[in-house]
């Protein structure tokens, strides 16, 4: 999840019904979201460098899942670098749009908390700004599900908003929504990953670019034991 530049989320002091209709929310904003973010990697050299490293390690090893793929731009970046990658997203409209924008790739609908993928079927998972839509209490369980579908030695690359607490939006791209996002401390995410059977390789962060929502950006890489 990203947010249009120049707009702010108020802090969520007392969570409401947490993301009561996340698929519907992304269905409503799919087109403007893609218009805003489909080419964002062109302006994010740090992210491209991390994805290039990920691609170098994944090339020729097997299938990779872009989890929470949105319009498919992260998966497309990997596909263009020779990775056997497909995208999965909770929003049917976002999946349809990703298929339209990336006709050479495969996309499907799914929930990262209960994946339809077989155990030990992926050599890598990249998931940018997807775990933020879970309540903090769900994070470890979701990571265990990701570990289930990864082969031993498979690589996980996460991106998330750094910080404390959570944020909420009632309006997104001009649409009425009710959407929540959890902010995670780097050490907190490392703890969840280790508990879910990942050996954490690296956690890095960067300040937000001026055109991004102004939270620290954190990236965590781990290998399934």
Predicted regions and their residues:
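Conserved beta-strand signature within the Rossmann-like core of class I S-adenosyl-L-methionine
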Residues: 153-160
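Conserved class I S-adenosyl-L-methionine
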Residues: 2-59, 164
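A short glycine-rich, Lys/Arg-flanked "PGG" loop and its adjoining helix->strand segment in the class I
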Residues: 140-152
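A short acidic, Gly/Pro-enriched loop at the edge of an enzyme's catalytic core
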Residues: 113-125
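Short alpha-helix
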Residues: 181-196
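Class I SAM-dependent methyltransferase SAM/SAH-binding core
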Residues: 63-67, 71-114
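Short, glycine-/aromatic-enriched active-site segment of Class I SAM-dependent methyltransferases
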Residues: 162-180
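Conserved S-adenosyl-L-methionine
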Residues: 198-209
